[in-house]
């Protein structure tokens, strides 16, 4: 987060606090911090293995919630097949994250009953991120507060570290340092671009495209840590693509241009 904060500072700098809507300053920005904090605590409190995967899956409700909030609170017009598209795309996420073992509702309920806090924290993280995105559209006025968000996140995680909450430090290595540097830069730039997109772009298209996040993560993992992509991954990719295209068409913009071109 220190790397990300530095990166974001050099990209967008500090916002003009006099121009920031007070609602965005006191509610929007803290909501983004709450999302980061609750997601990290959700992963920390999970028991690992299948439960960590399921917690991540719950958190991936945020693209769907972002679109839902855009329809409810930001006046975005859509069509009925947006909702089947959301279900198909989220189903693809489940298939990708579950892997060859598949997803069992019974086992999911059992693990939730054992450790509901972790799952609820992941849900809060998803809701708050969607809320931050909606508030950015409504109150952001084109101002990008990513530097402030990351600076506060860094302080929060420093406090957690001082309280001995989190993973134990590992020995430094060239590979680890590269992961920290490139990971921090990637996360920082993602925040900057996402906030800009929420301010001025097509919310539903951006949120639908976000379903490709775990897809790209898996592809990157094959190069960075040598992970293997199984058949369930590609099946999930197909579902994500189909669902995202349905969401795109439901906005009433993308497919109109496509039909005119053809």
Where are these regions (language model features)?
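Juxtamembrane helix-entry segments on the extracytoplasmic side of multipass membrane proteins
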Residues: 17-22, 98-125, 163-181, 228-238
């Amino acid at each position: 987060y220190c790397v990300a904060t530095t990166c974001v500072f050099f990209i967008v700098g500090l916002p003009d606090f006099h121009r920031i809507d007070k609602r965005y300053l006191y509610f929007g920005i803290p909501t983004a911090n709450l999302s980061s904090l609750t997601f990290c605590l959700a992963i920390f409190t999970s028991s690992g293995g299948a439960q960590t995967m399921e917690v991540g899956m719950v958190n991936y409700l945020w693209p769907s919630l972002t679109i839902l909030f855009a329809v409810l609170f930001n006046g975005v017009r859509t069509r009925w097949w947006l909702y089947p598209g959301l279900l198909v795309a989220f189903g693809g996420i489940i298939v990708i994250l579950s892997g060859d073992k598949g997803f069992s509702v019974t086992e999911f309920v059992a693990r939730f009953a054992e450790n509901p806090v972790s799952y609820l924290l992941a849900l809060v993280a998803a809701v708050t991120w969607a809320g931050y995105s909606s508030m950015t559209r409504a109150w952001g006025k084109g101002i990008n507060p990513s530097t402030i968000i990351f600076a506060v996140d860094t302080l929060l995680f420093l406090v957690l570290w001082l309280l001995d909450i989190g993973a134990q430090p590992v020995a430094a290595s060239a590979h680890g340092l590269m992961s920290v540097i490139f990971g921090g830069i990637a996360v920082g730039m993602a925040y900057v671009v996402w906030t800009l997109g929420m301010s001025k772009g097509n919310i539903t298209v951006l949120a639908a495209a976000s379903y490709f996040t775990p897809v790209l993560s898996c592809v990157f993992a094959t190069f960075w840590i040598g992970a293997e992509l199984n058949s369930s991954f590609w099946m999930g990719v197909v579902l994500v693509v189909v669902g995202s295209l349905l969401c795109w068409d439901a906005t009433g913009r993308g497919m109109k241009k496509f039909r005119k071109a053809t």
